[in-house]
Amino acid sequence: MLKRGDKLTAALNTGDPKQLSDMGLRYDLTLPLSRYYAANKDKLPSPFKVIQTDRVFRAERPQKGRLREFVQCDIDILGDASPNAEVELIDVTTRALLNIGFTGFTVNINDRRILRGMLESMGFAADTLDSVCITFDKMDKIGAEGVKAELTEKQLPESAIHALADFIAAGDVTLDAVAARCADPAIADDLKYVLATANTLAAGRYQVAYCPSLVRGQGYYTGMVFEVTCPQFSGAVAGGGRYDNMVGKFLGVQAVSYTHLRA
């Protein structure tokens, strides 16, 4: 809780950031887990698999779909660089959803590295890719023309914008077409493996689909990402992805996480 008034002024004058607040509210379960793993790795099994459920808080202005407090459920695997980690987490997530009564849902899957490689090949500079991805992620909401307009407003290269628009206008954006622009074929192979295996495990109970525009808003995701959408709900009911860099800040270990199922 941030101090106010004279107490805040006095705290600022100390030059010590720790004096600015009396306590904090937990934002998520992911960062604390990363710290715990880094401090206790030698005592833990490998890979390390965790399930957590607890309250978390956001500095949000309350509105539909935006809450200041909610219950977050995390399922994490740390220390597994293989795509089998993604397969397992998607399988556990979907079985949990089926067990609590969800039906007719779709698991949408993408890999940020493939998307970034495609965009860079079209002429977008590396330092603008995060911004481009955020706009591209809105494809299902604002459409191709909306994406083109927003990228133009950001004053990005006109030739790159036209290249992306032409690619979208060509029809269904397939994984093979996107992968052809990716510098590392192994990344596309891993994504194909996850899609095929997840579809086999679905056994017709739900759909599994490649979603080329899926990015997910959290900046810490580094590779494969996925979201579960359901016709009865306007937003995703579950989602997650690989976040190697976050754990790497504490210890050079790769990790994948299903980050939230809100209840």
Model-derived segments and their meaning:
Residues 67-73, 109-117:
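Short, conserved phosphate-binding/catalytic loop or strand-edge motifs used
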Residues 116-126, 219-226:
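Short glycine/threonine-rich loop-to-helix capping motif typified by GTGT followed
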Residues 94-98, 113-121:
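Hydrophobic mid-domain F-helix/FG-region of cytochrome P450s
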Residues 8:
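Anionic ligand-binding catalytic core segments
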Residues 105-107:
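A short amphipathic beta-strand at an alpha->beta junction
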Residues 124-143:
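Acidic, His- and aromatic-enriched active-site or binding-groove loops in soluble protein domains
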Residues 1-5:
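Short, structured active-site "lid" loops
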Residues 11, 15-20, 28-44, 49-103, ...:
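Positively charged, Gly/Ser-enriched RNA/tRNA-binding surfaces
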